[in-house]
Amino acid sequence: MSPYLAAEDLSMFGTDPWWLVVIKAVFCFAFLMVTVLFSIVWERKVVAWMQLRIGPNRHGPWGMLQSLADGIKLMLKEDVIVKRADKAVYVLAPIVAAIPAFMAIAVIPFGPAGNEVSIFGHRTAMQLTDLPIAMLFILAVASVGIYGIVLAGWSSGSTYPLLGGLRSCAQMISYEIAMGAAFASVFLYSGSMSTSEIVAQQDDRWYIVLLPVSFILYIVTMVGETNRAPFDMPESEGDLVGGFNTEYSSIKFAMFMLAEYVNMVTVSAVATTLFLGGWRAPWPISTFWEGANHGWWPLLWFVVKVQLLLFFFIWLRGTLPRVRYDQLMKLGWKVLIPVSLVWLMLVATVRALRNENYGFSDIALYIGGGVLVLLLLSFLVDMYRDKGGKAADQPAETGTGTGTGTETAFDPMAGGFPVPPMPGQQVPPVPRRRPRRERELIVSGGPDTHSDGPAGGPTDGKEASDG
């Protein structure tokens, strides 16, 4: 071993023997895979019930092995590589998308930080490793997964995957800003970026009660990060066929699907850790039963909370329609990011006042006064904005200034593209190719040009059939 490496303090990575670390790593991988297999079947069952269907019921008891059968089927299919694809990047893209999805689970605690469980005679914590900057690690590996999606769209050599990859990149980058602000508010309030320490700080009250705005922000951003309905614009079948993975098949397509569902499990585990008390038992159980947070019981509470959040994903898919791309970007940049920044400043102010030993009543008074001032300023800005808008719209209502009193014609392209049809709007029809007899000929050359044709009538078969 290098003397420089031996001199470093590696205790933050744990003191478990290497074989125990391997066992815990295999457990984390198996936990993700089993949860994904169950979540796929559960999603198909729940959506089928919501749509008054039966759902999968052929493979295994109650169709529980359907996702396993689908995975085997995909692996046995022909692996087609597009002729115009950049083969090296085309093959690496699913791997780049799948590997970061598994990495974040390494710092998620499944149980108390103390040595609570025994594995082959060794006392160990139910966590693979913990880092002083665990939250930054989660945010970093979530960002790396974007590269796999973008490279998949770019290397496919097709227009639709490229558009899907660009959409996904813009969407995930936009929503990661608000997600990072939600993370920052949590470790500002708790005073630590360690996941196990954040769970320990929720001994009295969960952060869903103390930081409700951060929880709502994270719930919205985690749906956008995973490209799930109603934010599944990168996979929009109506305009992108299948999205960034249109040209993929066999095991490569399965890896993209695996990465999507593993990301769902990972973000649900992160939400459980940050806002729902992590491995802690719910309030009534932990109050009347002290042993609920010891032994292997914390693993049960953690899994139940993760499954509830996965059901939230499924419920969104079966309930809400897909939003437009401009609405998606507007929500991210004009709503989530400003709200997250304002909320982050409020949380930082509360933290500073707590460090100065201010009481709860003083903090509530200062924060309440600041919120009232912000609301008053926003009201004044909206009021002056409405006045300016009415003054600008008045000439359009009275006419063009010529005294005729006619209304200005509505330009459907005035606000940019796309512009949805407004109530009462009359959009001019798309020009079509009309028969020669109904067209007005415009002489732009000699009489014997190909567009004019002979005087006797049309020359091409299409125009003859139109006539």
UniProtKB/Swiss-Prot annotation:
GO cellular component terms, A-Z: plasma membrane
Entry EC no(s): 7.1.1.-
Membrane topology: Multi-pass membrane protein
Localization: Cell membrane
Pfam families referenced in this protein's UniProt entry, alphabetically: NADHdh (PF00146)
Entry keyword set: Cell membrane, Membrane, NAD, Quinone, Translocase, Transmembrane, Transmembrane helix, Ubiquinone
NCBIfam families in the cross-refs: PRK06076.1-2 (NF004741), PRK06076.1-4 (NF004743)
Family per record: Belongs to the complex I subunit 1 family.
Descriptive protein name: NADH-quinone oxidoreductase subunit H
Species annotation: Streptomyces coelicolor (strain ATCC BAA-471 / A3(2) / M145)
Gene: nuoH
